[in-house]
Amino acid sequence: MEKSMWRHPQKMIIFPIFPIAAIWTSLPDSDYVYMCENSTIYGTKFHKRPDSKGKILINDISSCFLSEPMNVSDYDMLFGGIQKNLGPAGLVIAIIRKDLISETVLPGTPTMLRYKTHADKGSMYNTPPTYNIYIVGKVIKWIQSLGGLDKMKKINESKAALLYDYLDKSDMFCGLADKDSRSLMNITFRTGSEALDSAFVKAAGENGIISIKGHRAIGGIRANLYNAMPIEGVQHLVQFMEAFEKSEGQYE
């Protein structure tokens, strides 16, 4: 089945590739370009900074922050939730050029939603969620103990390669994302049959592999390989996929 033709039962088109810079367009009167570097739904990722044609470039890094090194100066603003790789839900990260922090805001903008409010108060305008911040500190020290972001990237590449290599040779499972757009964090795939996808998800759950079902918007199967996932977890998944394929979907 051609990946570009995959559709959810509700007729939602699935995008296996991020658009290349050559086909990007921007409105001449636009103030900025917004991008989401890593798509958890489709399992795709921008692997290099797109050309924003001189516009301010804002990057949502919620699902890939601290998974690999990045040059923050390539962007005018980076932001995202931290709940994928950095700590528990309830905190956000925002890295913004100082000259973009303005006194001028849209009328009616609440004080708490103004970047200047938090910049002026050192991110402590109100009582911060101290326990969440404590956990973030622990996670950062853990990443440093492994060897920092360069080492973290190598670990994540090794984990993803295990699964992608199997998908590339499998006769039953097929990866969704094109090779040049593949995510290290979220790997999406299918069997080509919704019934077989469901059977796989059910059997996986019975064998200690949970939350493997694809996003509700597109269905299928998805493996989330965030920093905290050990390589042994990916090895277990691949071994189970091999057994499931050999059983032709009749795994017991």
Name each model-derived stretch.
Residues H215, G219-E252:
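PLP-dependent enzyme catalytic core of the Aspartate aminotransferase-like
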Residues S198-N207, H236-E242:
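Short amphipathic alpha-helices in soluble, non-transmembrane regions
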